[in-house]
């Protein structure tokens, strides 16, 4: 198997792990995914005009800060979260690309969707660079007030 095919297979495994994780049950499962798939010296750019997150430990901390409120709203407030991805064929063969959508739905039926694209570079079967771009948002904001 050539290097590009191996990276593509690793990317498929990572994407499948992300979509299988259940935020209502645990946010820690996402941190375990970081441990399993990301290099110690990973660099992640979460959007334009944002400082890169450098290192697996910082990525774990950043991810936990983001996921804990979502986990609480899902576990206690009835927030439903679904995550989907579509692989994007790479033109250069060096990176992997995918398009993601996370849909948040509260019990009243209010829904908000977030979309973004991801570019990854792999080294030794670990992500060592990831960039999120082309962010899109649809639907009204969801906050704790909407659960009343």
Please place each PLM-identified region on the residue numbering.
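Short, low-complexity N-terminal intrinsically disordered segments enriched in polar/charged residues
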Residues: 1-32, 36, 40, 148
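A solvent-exposed, acidic/Ser-Thr-rich amphipathic alpha-helical stretch
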Residues: 31-96
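Short, ordered coil/turn segments that flank beta-strands lining enzyme active or ligand-binding pockets
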Residues: 40, 107, 123
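A generic structural motif
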Residues: 45, 103-107, 133
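Short, cysteine-centered beta-strand-loop-beta hairpins and adjacent loop/turn segments enriched
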Residues: 68, 72, 103-113
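Hydrophobic/aromatic beta-strand elements that line small-molecule binding cavities or substrate pockets
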Residues: 80-89, 102, 115-123
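Short Pro/Gly-enriched beta-strand edge/turn motifs at strand-loop
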Residues: 97-103
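Short beta-strand edge/turn micro-motifs at domain boundaries
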Residues: 113-146
């Amino acid at each position: 198997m050539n290097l590009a095919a191996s990276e593509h297979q690793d990317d498929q495994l990572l994407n499948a792990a992300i979509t299988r994780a259940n935020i209502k049950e645990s946010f820690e499962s996402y941190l375990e995914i970081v441990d399993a798939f990301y290099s110690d010296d990973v660099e992640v750019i979460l959007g334009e005009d944002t400082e890169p997150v450098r290192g697996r430990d910082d990525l774990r901390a950043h991810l936990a800060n983001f996921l804990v409120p979502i986990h609480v709203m899902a576990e206690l407030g009835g927030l439903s979260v679904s995550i989907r991805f579509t692989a994007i064929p790479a033109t250069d063969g060096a990176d992997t690309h995918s398009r993601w959508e996370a849909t948040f739905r509260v019990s009243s039926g209010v829904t908000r969707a977030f979309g973004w694209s991801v570019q990854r570079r792999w080294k030794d079967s670990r992500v060592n660079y990831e960039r999120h771009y082309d962010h899109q948002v649809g639907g009204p904001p969801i906050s704790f007030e909407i659960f009343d």
